[in-house]
């Protein structure tokens, strides 16, 4: 949620030798083994060559995309190339493998320096954020230092991001903080998805082009659709009357939630890739039953998020 969103080796076994053995061991050439070994090596080399060639081709296409003018279609195309060649959809939740693949295209693994954390940050929330940043592009953590911003990790029942250093009730600035000094990410310190989700809002806040692209994506998917209250889609939920969405056929209606200067597109996508769990609730079927979905059920959306991870 966004708060304040106005902003093949061959082995030949040896028999055991006793200490006084005077036997000689001679080499025996196994021609079939050599043939098998050569074949394996050739295939391995071909695989490495082809993968390297694919990486170079994707990098070339990636460098041709200017994020300042890029469309959502550009990033979907980029994401599609990586997904088809490296099966991102088959690696959901495997954070180390995801990081390994994305490292082929940009520097991954962000860190937050001790002096970037705002004082009195909650240790449990801080730990979760530290882990999430370590799997994300390095540039995302660098947004803070590059803009001379502090990060406060706060504890609250419901996770949210705020573009300033504020208390959990968002009624005042934290002691010692002034407008523009930093940003806040809140969570309960237990829910694993929160950190991966809220960092997405932080990234959007530092990169207006991403918000533009995400809004273009929503618009392309919801032409002619009228907003719907989330509380109507999910009875007995805690959604407020003012929380409305363009639900489309997204894996979660929450993806189309309306903000003036923010979206849930990147945040929901990141959560769906890095910490997918059992998927998202897509719709309420009645009688206490729900339909769920994963990001692999919406390839266009998946490819968009991959593209943003690479270029955002």
Name every feature range the model reports, one short phrase each.
Residues 1-111, 291-312:
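Activation/maturation switch segments at domain boundaries
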Residues 18, 197, 201, 264:
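Histidine-centered active-site/metal-ligand motif
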Residues 111-132:
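A short, highly charged nucleic-acid-interacting micro-segment common to nuclease
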Residues 121, 125, 192, 259, ...:
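Hydrophobic (often cysteine-bearing) scaffold residues that line and stabilize catalytic clefts
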Residues 126-206:
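Active-site scaffold of zinc-dependent metalloenzymes
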Residues 193-233:
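A contiguous pocket-lining binding segment that forms or flanks enzyme active sites
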Residues 218-312:
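Metalloprotease/metallohydrolase-associated module, dominated by Zn2+-dependent proteases
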């Amino acid at each position: 949620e966004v708060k304040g969103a106005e902003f093949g080796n061959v082995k030949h076994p040896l028999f055991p030798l006793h200490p006084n053995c005077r036997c000689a061991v001679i080499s025996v050439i196994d021609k079939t083994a050599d043939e098998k070994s050569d074949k394996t090596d050739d295939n391995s080399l071909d695989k490495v060559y082809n993968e390297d060639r694919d990486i170079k081709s994707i990098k070339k296409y990636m460098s041709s995309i200017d994020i300042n003018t890029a469309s959502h279609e550009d990033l979907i195309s980029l994401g599609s190339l990586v997904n088809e060649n490296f099966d991102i959809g088959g690696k959901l939740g495997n954070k180390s493998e995801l990081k390994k693949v994305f490292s082929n295209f940009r520097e991954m693994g962000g860190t937050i320096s001790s002096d970037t954390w705002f004082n009195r940050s909650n240790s449990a929330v801080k730990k979760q954020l530290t882990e999430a940043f370590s799997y994300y592009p390095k540039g995302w953590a660098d947004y803070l230092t590059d803009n001379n911003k502090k990060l406060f990790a706060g504890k609250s029942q419901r996770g949210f991001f705020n573009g300033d250093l504020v208390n959990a009730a968002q009624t005042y600035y934290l002691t010692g903080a002034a407008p523009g000094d930093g940003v806040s990410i809140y969570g309960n310190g237990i829910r694993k998805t929160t950190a991966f989700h809220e960092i997405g809002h932080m990234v959007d806040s530092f990169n207006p082009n991403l918000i533009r692209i995400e809004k273009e994506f929503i618009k392309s998917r919801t032409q002619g659709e009228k907003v719907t209250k989330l509380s109507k889609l999910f009875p007995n939920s805690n959604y407020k009357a003012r929380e409305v969405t363009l639900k489309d056929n997204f894996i979660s209606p929450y993806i189309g939630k309306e903000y003036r200067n923010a979206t849930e597109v990147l945040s929901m996508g990141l959560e769906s890739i890095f910490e997918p769990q059992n998927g998202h609730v897509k719709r309420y079927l009645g009688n206490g039953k729900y339909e769920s979905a994963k990001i692999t059920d919406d390839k266009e959306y998946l490819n968009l998020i991959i593209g943003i991870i690479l270029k955002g």
